[in-house]
């Protein structure tokens, strides 16, 4: 079972979109193996987005993700990374298709509601940054036999 990291960013929390986003994830057959709401520290935000540290928007990105509570999740499922990227839609909401989280719920690139890991390596790194292994609960869903061959 593949794991990925997903975060509902502070704009999604403030706009009361957490339930909508969790519902979309679960309806797609993915499992929520861990979930936490907290305000990300500046150190954690800088580590999380370190690949963008030389970009001009880095400071505002760190300020934004530390500006209020966010919801961090570990999501499990077959092809979880690829599926979550598809559910989220394009990073820029203007380019995101209707039916995706960003296409339906986000309006601005800087406030695009949700983050998901883009590769197995980043998923492992991001999960490890935000969760201890003991906090992650793998479990069989009652509908697994109807979802997977």
UniProtKB/Swiss-Prot annotation:
Which region is the signal sequence?
none
Q: Where are the transmembrane segments?
A: none
- Output the GO biological process annotations, alphabetical, semicolon-separated: CTP biosynthetic process; GTP biosynthetic process; UTP biosynthetic process
Top-level taxon in the UniProt lineage: Archaea
Molecular function in Gene Ontology: ATP binding; metal ion binding; nucleoside diphosphate kinase activity
Q: Which UniProt keywords apply?
A: ATP-binding, Cytoplasm, Kinase, Magnesium, Metal-binding, Nucleotide metabolism, Nucleotide-binding, Phosphoprotein, Transferase
Needed cofactors, names only, are: Mg(2+)
Q: Which residues bind ATP?
A: 9, 57, 85, 91, 102, 112
- State which Enzyme Commission number(s) the record gives: 2.7.4.6
CDD domains per record: NDPk_I
- Please report a single Pfam family linked to this protein: NDK
Catalysis: reaction(s): a 2'-deoxyribonucleoside 5'-diphosphate + ATP = a 2'-deoxyribonucleoside 5'-triphosphate + ADP; a ribonucleoside 5'-diphosphate + ATP = a ribonucleoside 5'-triphosphate + ADP
Database matches in SMART domains: NDK
Provide a GO CC annotation, any one: cytoplasm
**Record: active site:** 115 (pros-phosphohistidine intermediate)
- Location of this chain's protein in the cell: Cytoplasm
What biological function has been recorded for the protein in this entry? Major role in the synthesis of nucleoside triphosphates other than ATP. The ATP gamma phosphate is transferred to the NDP beta phosphate via a ping-pong mechanism, using a phosphorylated active-site intermediate.
The entry sums up its family as follows: Belongs to the NDK family.
Q: What is this protein called in UniProt? A: Nucleoside diphosphate kinase
Gene name as annotated:
ndk
């Amino acid at each position: 079972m593949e794991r990925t990291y997903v975060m509902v960013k502070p704009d999604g929390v403030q706009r009361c979109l957490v339930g909508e986003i969790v519902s979309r994830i679960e309806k797609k057959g993915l499992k929520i193996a861990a979930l936490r709401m907290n305000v990300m520290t500046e150190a954690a935000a800088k580590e999380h987005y370190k690949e963008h540290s030389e970009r001009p928007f880095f400071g505002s990105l760190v300020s934004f993700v530390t500006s209020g509570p966010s919801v961090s999740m570990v999501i499990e499922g077959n092809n979880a990374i690829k599926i979550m990227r598809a559910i989220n839609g394009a990073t820029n909401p203007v380019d995101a298709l209707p039916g995706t989280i960003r296409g339906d719920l986000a309006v601005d690139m800087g406030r695009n509601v949700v983050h998901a890991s883009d590769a197995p390596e980043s998923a492992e790194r991001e999960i490890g940054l935000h969760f201890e292994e003991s906090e992650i609960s793998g479990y069989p869903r009652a509908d697994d036999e109807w979802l997977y061959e």
